[in-house]
Every structure is written in C-alpha cells, then in structure tokens.
Amino acid sequence: MEAALLVEKNLNQALLDLHGLASARGDPHICDFLENHFLDEEV
C-alpha cells in the first residue's frame, strides 16, 4: 500500500513538472490536456 502511494505521488509530481514546463514554454494545448485529464483540483 505504501509503495502504491509513493508511485502515485511521484507520478503526480512528474505531471506537475511537465505542466510547469509546458506553461513556461507557452504551450496551452499540453497544459489544457494535462489539466483536463490528469490534474484534477483537490479540495
């Protein structure tokens, strides 16, 4: 169980890093795709 949480945390961080890179490079299509399919807002 702990390993699964670590994998999920690492994957989420990689997606956030990718989103940051796409944002810095001015690629709204990748940003939108990541936001709509992977980066749900958490309450």
From Swiss-Prot:
GO terms for molecular function: ferric iron binding; ferrous iron binding; iron ion binding. PROSITE patterns: FERRITIN_LIKE (PS50905). GO terms for biological process: intracellular iron ion homeostasis; iron ion transport. The keyword Cytoplasm applies. GO terms for cellular component: autolysosome; autophagosome; cytoplasmic vesicle; ferritin complex. SUPFAM superfamilies: Ferritin-like. Pfam families: Ferritin. Keywords: Cytoplasm, Cytoplasmic vesicle, Iron, Iron storage, Lysosome, Metal-binding. It is found in: Cytoplasmic vesicle, Autophagosome; Cytoplasm; Autolysosome. Residues 1-43 form the Ferritin-like diiron domain. Its main location: cytoplasm. InterPro entries: Ferritin, Ferritin-like, Ferritin-like_diiron, Ferritin-like_SF, Ferritin_DPS_dom. Signal peptide: none annotated. Belongs to the ferritin family. Stores iron in a soluble, non-toxic, readily available form. Important for iron homeostasis. Iron is taken up in the ferrous form and deposited as ferric hydroxides after oxidation. Also plays a role in delivery of iron to cells. Mediates iron uptake in capsule cells of the developing kidney. Delivery to lysosomes by the cargo receptor NCOA4 for autophagic degradation and release or iron. Oligomer of 24 subunits. There are two types of subunits: L (light) chain and H (heavy) chain. The major chain can be light or heavy, depending on the species and tissue type. The functional molecule forms a roughly spherical shell with a diameter of 12 nm and contains a central cavity into which the insoluble mineral iron core is deposited. Interacts with NCOA4. This is Ferritin light chain. The gene is FTL.
